[in-house]
């Protein structure tokens, strides 16, 4: 079983990280090409392109300038511990055991606009480059054109290494679009998280993001290998609703106490 998740805009390169045997990101040749494109953009260009403040644009221009193909523990940190958005709040990597992190290294991948696909212990440098960014590059008008089949093939290789042909899609639509589903040879399960608010079950973005992280944590902590085991997920008060689910879309519901 392989789970895929999105990265996060919020990063943590300050707090202490446990000592794990780190790995190198696989697609730095591609990353370097994107960095070269980004370095040609002014902070004003970045602000417009990414719809971010001047302050954030300046920070990211500096990050692009400082980025280097050489990744070590002085300029990088493992991706699993660098991302700190809503999904990663649910995942709570800092509290995972060493065995859990080792399991995650084989069973979890993070999609990335800059790095393509990251293993949890792959080193990464601070950056902001969302997959949906319309960054013109030598291969096309955006990052989907740039990555082409590269991410899809890497995901398939990771699935093949599991031997059970199961992909759990916990990524956002923006990032999952970089995976060409028609080319994936696996049973793809998409968990959907619905919260009951004012008498109606619906997707509430903040809660859904955190729930995707919780599901990721559940897979990692229980070392899941079977599809049916996903239905036992109960973290955060969610429960599997078989009546609303299909063979490939697993619906989990929760009642919010106001």
Swiss-Prot record:
GO terms for cellular component: cytosol. InterPro entries: YaaA. Coiled coil: none annotated. GO terms for biological process: response to hydroperoxide. Belongs to the UPF0246 family. NCBIfam families: PRK02101.1-1, PRK02101.1-3. This is UPF0246 protein CGSHiEE_07045. It comes from Haemophilus influenzae (strain PittEE). The lineage of its organism: Bacteria, Pseudomonadati, Pseudomonadota, Gammaproteobacteria, Pasteurellales.
């Amino acid at each position: 079983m392989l789970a895929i998740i999105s990265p996060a805009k919020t990063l943590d390169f300050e707090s202490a990280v446990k000592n794990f045997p780190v790995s190198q990101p696989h697609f730095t040749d591609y990353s370097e090409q994107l960095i070269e494109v980004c370095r040609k953009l002014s902070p004003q260009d970045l602000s417009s392109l990414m719809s971010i403040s001047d302050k954030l644009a300046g920070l990211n221009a500096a990050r692009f300038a400082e980025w280097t193909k050489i990744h070590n523990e002085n300029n990088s940190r493992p991706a699993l511990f660098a991302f700190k958005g809503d999904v990663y709040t649910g995942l709570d990597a800092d509290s995972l055991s060493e065995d859990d992190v080792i399991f995650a290294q084989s069973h979890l991948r993070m999609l990335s606009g800059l790095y393509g696909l990251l293993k949890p212990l792959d080193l990464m440098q601070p950056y902001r480059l969302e997959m949906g960014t319309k960054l013109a590059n030598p291969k096309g008008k955006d990052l989907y054109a740039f990555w082409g089949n590269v991410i899809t093939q890497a995901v398939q290789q990771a699935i093949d290494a599991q031997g059970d042909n199961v992909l759990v899609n916990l990524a956002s639509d923006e990032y999952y679009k970089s995976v060409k589903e028609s080319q994936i040879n696996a049973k793809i399960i998409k968990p959907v998280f619905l919260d009951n608010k004012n008498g109606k079950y619906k997707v509430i973005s903040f809660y859904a993001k955190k729930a995707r992280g919780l599901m990721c944590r559940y897979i990692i902590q229980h070392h899941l290998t079977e599809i049916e085991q996903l239905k036992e997920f109960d973290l955060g008060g969610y429960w599997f609703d078989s009546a609303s689910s299909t063979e490939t879309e697993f619906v989990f519901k929760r009642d919010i106490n106001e």
